[in-house]
């Protein structure tokens, strides 16, 4: 009986011991603490004395009073929490602040019933059980739900107790109970209802914060930058004083600079134009191929205008949630209105301003562009705001976006001409250390078709290569190598591939391209030919125009087709039809595209006629439906095949009549790996190339690397002999 009593003593106070370990005390009156502890200790002590076989309790009332007083200092008990004890189908809840007991019972498929005992409830007499009676039932047979660890400890206690003599069992039991009371026993019931409520509240709070951050309603500032949401970046305002780019840094686009300089002048002195009745243009659209300097021009406007400047990208308006794209547009213009006069720059506007479509799958797809149209020129005018946008796909923009009143000025930024390239080379060469023998005009003539970004990359690549070689300055040789890198791609560092049979095939293939280009009247002039792998190709034949080309003739396009066919024809003539390789795949693809354009777009077929058939090609449609008659489609295919076959025959005639030159050029490529246009002409005329072969250069370099160690060895031997 004593062991059962001691066990239930530990079960009754296990939660009290746990709460006593977390001392989050608050300011409470000492008298209240003493009264609460005393009321609980009297009840517990009365229970123990009633059901103890021995008159003396293993725990004195003073010890219980101290434990309960410490537990009352807990923040949870101070906030009228409760101690829950689970027993089978019942829960005993003890509220220390009011010395009240609650007994809850839940049967199978019955609702929860709550009974109160103490100051906090007024239950009927039939529904209430006395706490002492309830505890006696527990001690009589019902077991308390404990954790697996508590059961194991109790089993160990019973086993150890039976091994001890009777005179030592009482002392062992007293020590076990005191340790249980001081450290607490795990597995106590907790305030589940309050814990669940707090957990749900915290989850709801975290969800609200995350959703607000997701949609941009809650904004976080990181340093000087304000981040609106996780997925939707905000338009960034640029401080004009922080922009170091001016119109002096913009080279090779004089006409475009003149257009935007008028807008900057208007922002600086609006009265100069308003007194004559002029109004500020609503928008400026920068149109041009990639790399021509559209974004650079926008940076220069920000540095010259000295007004608030907002920049964003068209892709930033694409939102995950419906309606967020339109909200982003409204937020952008709201910020701009507060800082007017100002400039808004939207890069790659084709992402948001493309043509509107009727899509039943996504009926809200046009909300963003509709909001942009309304903000630029809707019912409410936005005075003092200029929208500058850049795109290289102007044909994809919606017509409503291009009308006057929205984009009043369209500025074309083309590739630089010869004078523009000279100006750009002078600008970037001034930023590096180079030799005095570099002529920017020569570089400009040899870089026809280069954009400003290509020239910047070319000069930078030359400087990096010179630094890698520990050179004192950048020479013309480094610039030529960098130009080839831009034109043909990076070369394989190890030179030609180790497969000599593949190198031989590549040499005859590239020699075929080269000879056809040399003996075709309107072909683009040859620049360089190589069998060193560059990029995805095993070899490359580079063409470089002598002057800027603004349009192409039919003869020039046919000559280009002939040059493309030269590689495949060379393989067939040298190795046979069964030994042709896949090296001509890219040539055939480009030749087919050019032939299709000649027949379907440019009207260069007499049988097809002067008609554009590209209107039938709707690449964005899920199902392509052609309005062409079957006879017309067959005629177009026949004409495309005819153009390609005639080009193949012309290339074959050239290579059949130039077999000797073809053989000499292929052998020279196998020996020297790379040949310039002048060297090619010397080879086919029977002259020798006056430079060492790559194999000789490699051998010489190996000799030089071994020479210092040999000299050092001789020096050591000589010094050893003198000793």
UniProtKB/Swiss-Prot annotation:
In its UniProt record, which GO terms are filed under biological process? mitochondrial protein processing
Q: Which GO cellular component terms are attached?
A: m-AAA complex
Pfam families recorded for this chain?
Answer: AAA, AAA_lid_3, Peptidase_M41
Catalytic residues, per the record, are 510
Key words, A-Z = ATP-binding, Hydrolase, Membrane, Metal-binding, Metalloprotease, Mitochondrion, Mitochondrion inner membrane, Nucleotide-binding, Protease, Transmembrane, Transmembrane helix, Zinc
Domain of life of the source: Eukaryota
Q: Read off the SMART domains from this record.
A: AAA
Q: Where mainly located?
A: mitochondrion
Annotated positions binding Zn(2+): 509, 513, 587
- Cofactor mode of binding and number, as noted: Binds 1 zinc ion per subunit.
Name of the featured protein? ATP-dependent zinc metalloprotease YME1 homolog
Organism in which the protein naturally occurs: Caenorhabditis elegans
């Amino acid at each position: 009986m004593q062991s059962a009593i001691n066990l239930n003593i530990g079960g009754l106070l296990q939660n009290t011991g746990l709460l006593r370990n977390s001392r989050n005390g608050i300011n409470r009156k000492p008298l209240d603490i003493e009264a609460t502890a005393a009321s609980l200790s009297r009840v517990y002590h009365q229970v123990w004395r009633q059901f103890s076989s021995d008159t003396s309790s293993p725990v004195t009332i003073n010890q219980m009073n101290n434990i309960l007083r410490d537990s009352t200092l807990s923040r949870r008990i101070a906030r009228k929490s409760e101690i829950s004890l689970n027993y089978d189908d019942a829960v005993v809840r003890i509220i220390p602040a009011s010395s009240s007991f609650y007994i809850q019972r839940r049967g199978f498929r019955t609702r929860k019933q709550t009974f109160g005992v103490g100051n906090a409830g007024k239950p009927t007499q039939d529904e209430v059980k006395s706490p002492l009676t309830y505890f006696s039932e527990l001690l009589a047979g019902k077991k308390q739900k404990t954790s697996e660890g508590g059961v194991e400890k109790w089993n160990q206690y019973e086993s150890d107790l039976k091994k001890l003599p009777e005179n030592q069992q009482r002392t062992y039991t007293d020590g076990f109970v005191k340790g249980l009371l001081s450290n607490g026993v795990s597995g106590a019931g907790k305030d589940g209802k309050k814990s669940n409520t707090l957990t749900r509240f915290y989850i709801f709070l975290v969800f609200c914060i995350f959703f607000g951050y997701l949609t941009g309603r809650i904004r976080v500032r990181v340093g000087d930058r304000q981040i609106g949401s996780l997925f939707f970046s905000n338009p960034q305002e640029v401080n004009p004083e922080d922009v170091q780019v001016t119109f002096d840094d913009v080279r090779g686009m004089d006409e475009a600079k003149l257009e935007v300089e008028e807008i900057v002048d208007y922002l600086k002195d609006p009265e100069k134009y308003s007194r004559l009745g002029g109004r500020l243009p609503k928008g400026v659209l920068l149109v041009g191929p990639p790399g021509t300097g559209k974004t650079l021009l926008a940076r220069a406007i920000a540095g010259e205008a000295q007004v608030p400047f907002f920049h964003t990208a068209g892709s930033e308006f694409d939102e995950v949630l419906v309606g967020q794209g339109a909200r982003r547009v409204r937020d952008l213009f709201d910020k701009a209105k507060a800082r007017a006069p100002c400039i808004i720059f939207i890069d790659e506007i084709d992402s948001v301003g493309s043509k509107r479509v009727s899509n039943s799958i996504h009926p809200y797809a046009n909300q963003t562009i509709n909001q942009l149209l309304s903000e630029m020129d809707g019912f409410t005018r936005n005075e003092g705001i200029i929208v500058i946008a850049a795109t290289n796909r102007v044909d994809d923009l919606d017509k409503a976006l291009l009308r006057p009143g929205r984009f009043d000025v369209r500025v074309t930024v083309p590739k630089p001409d010869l004078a523009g390239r000279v100006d750009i080379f002078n600008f970037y060469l001034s930023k590096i250390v180079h030799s005095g023998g570099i002529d920017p005009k020569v570089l400009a003539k040899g870089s026809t078709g280069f954009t400003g970004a290509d020239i910047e990359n070319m000069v930078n690549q030359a400087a990096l290569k010179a630094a890698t070689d520990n050179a004192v300055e950048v020479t013309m040789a480094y610039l030529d190598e960098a130009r080839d890198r831009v034109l043909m791609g990076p070369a394989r560092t190890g030179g030609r591939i180790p497969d000599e049979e593949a190198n031989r095939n590549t040499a005859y293939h590239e020699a075929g391209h080269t000879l056809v280009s040399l003996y075709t009247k309107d072909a683009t002039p040859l620049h360089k030919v190589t069998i060193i792998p560059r990029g995805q190709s095993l070899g490359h034949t580079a063409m470089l125009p002598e002057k800027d080309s603004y349009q192409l003739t039919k003869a020039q396009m046919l000559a280009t087709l002939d040059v493309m066919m030269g590689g495949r024809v060379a393989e067939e003539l040298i190795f046979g039809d069964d030994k042709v390789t896949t090296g001509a795949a890219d040539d055939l693809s480009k030749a087919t595209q050019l032939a299709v354009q000649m027949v379907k777009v440019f009207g260069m077929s007499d049988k097809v006629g002067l008609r554009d058939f590209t209107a039938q090609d709707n690449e964005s449609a899920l199902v392509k439906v052609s309005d062409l008659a079957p006879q017309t489609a067959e005629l177009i295919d026949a004409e495309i095949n005819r153009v390609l076959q005639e080009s193949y025959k012309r290339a074959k005639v050239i290579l059949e009549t130039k077999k000797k030159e073809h053989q000499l050029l292929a052998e020279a490529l196998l020996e020297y790996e790379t040949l310039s246009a002048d060297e090619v002409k010397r080879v086919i005329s029977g002259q020798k190339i006056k430079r060492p072969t790559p194999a000789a250069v490699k051998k010489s370099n190996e000799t030089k690397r071994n020479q210092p160690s040999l000299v050092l060895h001789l020096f050591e031997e000589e010094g050893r002999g003198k000793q």
